[in-house]
Amino acid sequence: MSKTHLTEQKFSDFALHPKVVEALEKKGFHNCTPIQALALPLTLAGRDVAGQAQTGTGKTMAFLTSTFHYLLSHPAIADRKVNQPRALIMAPTRELAVQIHADAEPLAEATGLKLGLAYGGDGYDKQLKVLESGVDILIGTTGRLIDYAKQNHINLGAIQVVVLDEADRMYDLGFIKDIRWLFRRMPPANQRLNMLFSATLSYRVRELAFEQMNNAEYIEVEPEQKTGHRIKEELFYPSNEEKMRLLQTLIEEEWPDRAIIFANTKHRCEEIWGHLAADGHRVGLLTGDVAQKKRLRILDEFTRGDLDILVATDVAARGLHIPAVTHVFNYDLPDDCEDYVHRIGRTGRAGASGHSISLACEEYALNLPAIETYIGHSIPVSKYNPDALMTDLPKPLRLTRPRTGNGPRRTGAPRNRRRSG
């Protein structure tokens, strides 16, 4: 982490349980990020928190630290059964649930608290086997949690801590009824510690969330620009015919160490993947219909650096903790203004700098005014020379092979294609 991303406040300054501090310091976490420094004094005092902070600022460790401390500092409910978890952490996507579980594992190892994971798609029996042995902290998506609860594999009557992560996305995706169904099966709000975290929290979301919380304290860490000072933003106006060639030329010019390319549809993502894979790039594809095991493998390969480029729909835009992303390309301008913030928030994380490049084509340029109004500034426009765009491009591949790493490792220097002024 960059020192500019941290505060002078240390985890050891708080009255945290010693095992929690030990686990944090073992992982190299000594100083708090701003959202952690604001949240911990409240949660340690038993206050509910609704926290808004730009993505990549440490929200996950804020609620995990609070959760582990609370469970270690408060006895379980009397006569708690083996199928009754003590804490429930809800996430909008299975990828985010898996990531939270991975982040929680060092704390679980140090404290002896048991973790469980529940998400749809696959792994039903494997997840159930863990739950049947008893878990303290259950992390999951609402649909699978309800499934297990209806079959009495889990009972929420002993819940002491509840977390809603990426809460705005959960409401946007229509999970309000699911969330309320789960809350109705828990002890009352004043008998739990309740936390809600997200990068963006509209008044509507806060109002809905506070229905399930006990006089929550609202905390916010937000830069003057919603998009962050460390992210260089750039905008091009290509024609539809030149759009793909411009993207490939920009990739050759920028030669990003690790890039995510966002498009608005699965079909468009597959098209981009086909062009880049044919051109020898180590590229992975992440869309909603990719099998769960493959999705997790692709994310792991991208995180490890075995893939240089990830082409994704907005399923990957929220909550995933992928370090060291240097570039984000908006091949399509998103229809939702908040998705623009979340997309480019994949870069410039944890104090690092990043570069966001957006293509305002004939189809999606109409989305630009609303985006610029929402972020509070105009995106700087750059021009390109159509005659300098790449032309020696192979025929795109089709998805008849595994969707990861089809191109060889990049060993040569990038081709020199310069923009116009």
From Swiss-Prot:
InterPro entries: DEAD/DEAH_box_helicase_dom (IPR011545), DEAD_box_RNA_helicase (IPR050079), Helicase_ATP-bd (IPR014001), Helicase_C-like (IPR001650), P-loop_NTPase (IPR027417), RNA-helicase_DEAD-box_CS (IPR000629), RNA_helicase_ATP-dep_RhlB (IPR023554), RNA_helicase_DEAD_Q_motif (IPR014014). It comes from the Bacteria. One of its GO terms (cellular component) is membrane. The gene is rhlB. This is ATP-dependent RNA helicase RhlB. GO terms for biological process: RNA catabolic process; RNA processing. One of its GO terms (molecular function) is RNA helicase activity. CDD domains: DEADc (cd00268), SF2_C_DEAD (cd18787). Its main location: cytoplasm. ATP binds at A53, Q54, T55, G56, T57, G58, K59, T60. Belongs to the DEAD box helicase family. RhlB subfamily. Residues 402-414 have a biased composition (Low complexity). Its EC number is 3.6.4.13. The keyword Signal does not apply. ATPase activity is stimulated by interaction with RNase E. Keywords: ATP-binding, Cytoplasm, Helicase, Hydrolase, Nucleotide-binding, RNA-binding. It comes from Escherichia coli (strain K12). It catalyses: ATP + H2O = ADP + phosphate + H(+). It holds the Pfam family Helicase_C. Residues 40-219 form the Helicase ATP-binding domain. Residues 392-421 are annotated as: Disordered. A motif (DEAD box) lies at residues 165-168. DEAD-box RNA helicase involved in RNA degradation. Has RNA-dependent ATPase activity and unwinds double-stranded RNA. Coiled coil: none annotated.
